[in-house]
């Protein structure tokens, strides 16, 4: 759903799009979106989005549009919009790792440069480099990646987690309340996470760690993106992985 940057028709546009899905089993939608009350909370969130659109008028380029995305069937990602929505679904915690179809998500997200929370594609990078060369300004992206940072998109304080280095967590990571990422070798990939653990090592995609466990400094849990490992690994509650160890199947 696309709407003008003023957001004047955003609510009606979105609700009209939902109504077009009249053949969708409403109970199924609610079951897979249990965190949303479709009659109340969705409208409240849409109104909050509308207010945000209006508030950002002065900072929004005229050629930008807002896109609202809905997923009714959990098929593999089709583009940037539904890929990003699924990553939000994990990091906001309505879904846990391995509950959403993320097959081939790498092919749907472009590799971009990030300056703050703003992604730049190849053409925009060229423009920024040229502008910096002539103006003496500094072109300094903090990373080149397909995924936004967790802390740039999620209210980590509200989620009850501690993250000592913003670059250690991608959007799409599931961090349960009480999770702490310590300085150093800690890292949580997308489609991975914890129910509230102390993380001083690496949790790869598809891996999950139970509440009260401690992943020691430099320890690594292999994920399904690792060569030769196709089985998601779960570490239970109150477990300890000692420093510099590796866990895989």
Where are these regions (language model features)?
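Structural signal for interior beta-strand "rungs" in well-ordered beta-sheet cores
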Residues: 156-249
